[in-house]
């Protein structure tokens, strides 16, 4: 199934450049866009993934059809980084997770512009283009922290920037890519050392969280009690294991803590 799934993701990524942006709509929330490419890719993925695992269901960003159950469920973001796509920023990805018993057992992120395939299966490690990857061991004061601004939720903008500034004062620097999936993938392979965003949907973090965990990293919902859940919007905090406590301490100081 792995090879077939990777081919499905690559075909979906071809839509990014092979199709023209003929329609851009505004969804609910500030700067929340959907294009004809988002819809075309999701339609393709739904058909391909349901054929790959008969009896499964698909939860996608554009349709949000179905709810997460114990049954095999694909959680899909057809274009993570739609605003980047609109501006030809070339930092967008296809994100696919397969959940069983409400937990990801497989995660894939395909960045077509860089031809990079991030992949993980629960208990079997993570890879980039077939080579095993691990999170970094960079110390806290030299860490690079990626973040998202939760742009669809303007009420979180000030808190997001305040938190980013706090990390900037504590670590080496901060980065903003515009794609949570890519940020999590880059964390998994050591390109940066931590990531936060104050509001993400399951299709933003389901695949990436598994890839980070299988690469030896830590992923939490710092404002939620208990373990990671994949059926809700939530703040996401992720990092390498060696700086997890320090990253969490800054987050708690500036953005709150578990309920």
Q: Residue spans of the language-model regions?
A:
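N-terminal subdomain of lithium-sensitive/metallo-dependent phosphomonoesterases centered on the IMPase/IPPase/PAP
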Residues: 1-79, 256-259
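Residue-level signal for inorganic ion chemistry
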Residues: 16, 38, 49, 82, ...
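Active-site-adjacent structural elements in enzyme catalytic cores
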Residues: 51, 59, 68-134, 210-213
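Acidic, metal-binding active-site segment of PIN/NYN-like and related structure-specific nucleases
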Residues: 57-63, 216-231
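A short, glycine/Asx- and small/polar-enriched loop/turn
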Residues: 68-72, 140, 188-191, 230-233
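Acidic beta-strand-loop-alpha-helix segment within the catalytic core
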Residues: 97-184, 226, 232-259
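Acidic, metal-associated active-site segment
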Residues: 183-189, 206-214
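Alpha-to-beta junction loops
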Residues: 189-194, 217-218
